A protein has these predicted regions:
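Cofactor-binding loop segments of dinucleotide-utilizing enzymes, especially the Rossmann-like FAD-
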Residues: 11-12, 43
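Eukaryote-biased intrinsically disordered, low-complexity acidic regions enriched in Ser/Thr/Pro
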Residues: 40-53
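A generic structural motif
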Residues: 32-39
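Glycine- and acidic-residue-enriched helix-capping/strand-helix junction motifs
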Residues: 13-26, 30
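Hydrophobic alpha-helical packing residues
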Residues: 31-32, 77, 105
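A short, GP-enriched loop/loop-strand-helix hinge that lies immediately N-terminal to
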Residues: 12-16, 55-96, 111-120
Length: 140
């Protein structure tokens, strides 16, 4: 088992790149300490298509944010049939989509604060003032 080759994927292109690099470095240190062979991959520097499944046994996903936590890389890893750490494709997508997450919580009777949905392309301060009445939003 200690001969397993672990590819730590870190960095990426999201706004959370720096956090991902820090996470990846900590993971690399811990995985090496356990005696595994570790290599790294940063999708900002190389295309995911360059991942060679013959040279790795498992992928440790240390990416944060878009493409790393939303099911995108998970989908690619499943396509390659490489085991990976992280939630699966659908769970990752649902967790990153806050509206879907809220609907799942409500459907399963999990208390969650009220919310409003704003689309980036039509968000203005004037619309915000018209749509939100802060007193109506309370924690469960």
């Amino acid at each position: 088992m200690k001969n397993k080759k672990v590819l730590v994927i870190l960095g990426g292109t999201s706004g959370e790149r720096e956090v991902s690099l820090d996470t990846g470095k900590a993971c690399i240190k811990a995985i090496k300490k356990l005696g595994y062979k570790v290599s790294t991959f940063d999708p900002k520097k190389k295309s995911l298509s360059l991942i060679n499944k013959k040279k790795i046994d498992v992928i440790f996903n240390a990416l944060h944010g878009k493409d790393g936590e939303d099911g995108v890389v998970q989908s690619y890893f499943e396509y390659l049939r490489i085991p990976y750490t992280h939630s699966g494709v659908i769970s990752s997508y649902n967790a990153m989509n806050k509206v879907i997450s809220k609907e799942i919580f409500k459907k399963n009777r999990i208390k969650t604060p009220s919310y409003f949905v704003f689309r980036k392309n039509n968000f203005t301060k004037a619309k915000l003032n018209k749509l939100i009445q802060i007193k109506k939003i309370k924690f469960p």
